[in-house]
């Protein structure tokens, strides 16, 4: 199996550079306050930010981004490793009530759907988990520690995943340019760049999660611009492209036609130098080809919302495919999201006096997602190289701001369909800690604490509606045992 790479950036161009080179990274945004990071570094050196060279600046920010994501993954791994309680595994397809003929008919429905028109996953029944309510499912119970020891994950890895942080800045006439953010700033900069030559610097920091070893380096290239008119600048700015990129231009987009020539690595201008990244991996003793996880010419799988354009509902354009993403044709006759399975966190809050469960965190799902508009728990596909518990902790932080260092895992429930499974991870806030959930991305309309008695009154995701009675009972048992 390939060594997973985590890109500490939401930059789609950086992600695309890696993908075209055979590496599909996991995207983890660092949320680094860049001006604050530069100010802090300058204070340590006893200088001002203006005194820092462009190389120093991009390296400071690349390291800050990689280290922030490394800390976040460390929190995930530590919380997962400290999990207590039992894992219950349910096998609904082995229940007597699920007859072979029913399964065969369901699989045939799946084949017919796959051969037909594009599926609107936000509404199609085939993307809805089957309702197994009223079915006596065979179950197996084991200590959760046994499950953790037997599953590959961050805590068991001897190498990787690798965490890559990058930052780019443009140097022109002795002045450092980051992202312009506004049309006025972009216009002023672009007019200066006409017919001029500048340098694009990109800092790189690579961390091996398993060992904690860190390597770093910077790439730079000279960019020779052609001459362009004020009208060219106005029309370019109108595309929106130059507003959120270092230097106010892109090599691979609309701005590429205005670049006459380049001296140096062109990938570094896009924001990630492949030769330098390969060299850094080598310093860690890792062969670059061991990171390959995409076949040559391999197309990306369907998105979570494939077919939604027919329903007039579009997922955000910035959403990108990540390792573990994809629809699975399940033995139950439905399609499920997550090639490695999926998982989520059912986080409960207890009364500080009685210890009883009072609230749980719930997610109001975005309209474009499967069963959009319903309520469930934050979670998603398990990425390559992580266990279901680690995946649930990562996804719930990314989606709902459930900070792993503030919760304790006390059990799990795995619904196993054979080729696919979903793991619900039960957790409580740690004593003295408070989780403040919020929607961190576009997969939710709302994330909030919901009173435990109000959960059945919400329009629930099919699987949650089926499972809620037993989940509520188990939360009560777990709260009593704490």
From Swiss-Prot:
CDD domains cross-referenced by the UniProt entry: Maf (cd00555)
- Read off the InterPro entries from this record: ITPase-like_fam (IPR029001), Maf-like (IPR003697), NUDIX_hydrolase-like_dom_sf (IPR015797), NUDIX_hydrolase_CS (IPR020084), NUDIX_hydrolase_dom (IPR000086)
Q: Note whether Nucleus occurs among the keywords.
A: no
Please report any disulfide bonds recorded for this protein chain, giving both cysteine positions. Answer: none
Q: Where is this region: Maf-like?
A: 1-299
What EC number(s) does its UniProt record assign? 3.6.1.9
What is its cofactor? Answer: a divalent metal cation
PROSITE patterns tied to this protein: NUDIX, NUDIX_BOX
Keywords of this entry: Cytoplasm, Hydrolase, Nucleotide metabolism
Show the HAMAP family listed in the entry.
Maf (MF_00528)
Q: Can you name this protein?
A: Nucleoside triphosphate pyrophosphatase/Nudix hydrolase fusion protein
Q: Write down the species.
A: Bifidobacterium longum (strain NCC 2705)
Q: What is the lineage of its organism?
A: Bacteria, Bacillati, Actinomycetota, Actinomycetes, Bifidobacteriales
């Amino acid at each position: 199996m390939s060594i997973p790479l985590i890109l500490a950036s939401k930059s789609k161009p950086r992600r695309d550079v890696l993908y075209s080179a055979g590496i599909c990274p996991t995207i983890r945004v660092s949320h680094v306050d860049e001006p604050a990071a530069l100010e802090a570094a300058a204070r340590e050196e006893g200088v001002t930010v203006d005194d820092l060279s462009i190389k120093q600046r991009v390296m400071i920010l690349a390291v800050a981004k990689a280290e922030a994501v490394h800390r976040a993954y460390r929190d995930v791994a530590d919380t997962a490793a400290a999990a207590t309680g039992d894992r219950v595994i349910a096998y609904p397809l082995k229940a007597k009530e699920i007859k072979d003929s029913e399964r065969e008919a369901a699989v045939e429905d799946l084949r017919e759907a796959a051969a037909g028109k594009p599926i609107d996953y936000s509404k199609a029944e085939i993307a809805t988990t089957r309702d197994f309510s009223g079915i006596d499912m065979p179950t197996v119970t084991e200590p959760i520690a046994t499950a953790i020891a037997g599953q590959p994950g961050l805590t068991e890895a001897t190498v990787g995943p690798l965490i890559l942080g990058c930052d780019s800045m443009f140097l022109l006439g002795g002045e450092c340019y980051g992202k312009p953010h506004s049309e006025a700033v972009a216009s002023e900069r672009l007019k200066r760049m006409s017919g001029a030559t500048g340098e694009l610097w990109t800092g790189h920091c690579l961390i091996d999660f398993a060992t904690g070893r860190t390597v770093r380096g910077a790439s730079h290239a000279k960019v020779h611009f052609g001459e362009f008119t004020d009208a060219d600048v106005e029309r370019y700015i109108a595309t929106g492209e130059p507003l959120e990129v270092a230097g106010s231009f892109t090599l691979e987009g609309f701005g590429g036609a205005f670049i006459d020539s380049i001296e140096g690595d062109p990938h570094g201008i896009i924001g990630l130098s492949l030769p330098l990244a390969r060299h850094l991996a080598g310093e860690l003793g890792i062969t670059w080809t061991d990171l390959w996880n995409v076949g040559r010419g391999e197309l990306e799988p369907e998105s979570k919302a494939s077919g939604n354009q027919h329903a007039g509902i579009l997922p955000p354009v910035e959403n990108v495919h990540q390792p573990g993403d994809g629809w699975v044709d399940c033995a139950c006759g439905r399609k499920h999201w997550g090639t490695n399975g999926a998982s989520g966190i059912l986080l409960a809050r207890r009364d500080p006096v009685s210890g009883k469960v009072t609230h749980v965190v719930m997610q109001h799902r975005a309209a474009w997602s499967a069963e959009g508009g319903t309520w469930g728990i934050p979670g998603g596909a398990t990425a390559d190289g992580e266990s279901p518990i680690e995946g649930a902790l990562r996804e719930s932080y990314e989606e709902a701001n459930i900070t792993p260092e503030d919760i304790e895992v006390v059990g799990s429930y795995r619904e196993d369909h054979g080729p696919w499974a979903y793991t619900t991870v039960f957790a409580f806030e740690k004593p003295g800690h408070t989780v403040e959930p919020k929607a961190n991305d576009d997969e939710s309309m709302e994330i909030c604490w919901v009173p435990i008695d109000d959960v059945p009154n919400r329009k629930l995701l099919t699987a949650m509606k089926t499972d809620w009675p037993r989940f509520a009972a188990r939360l009560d048992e777990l709260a009593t045992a704490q």
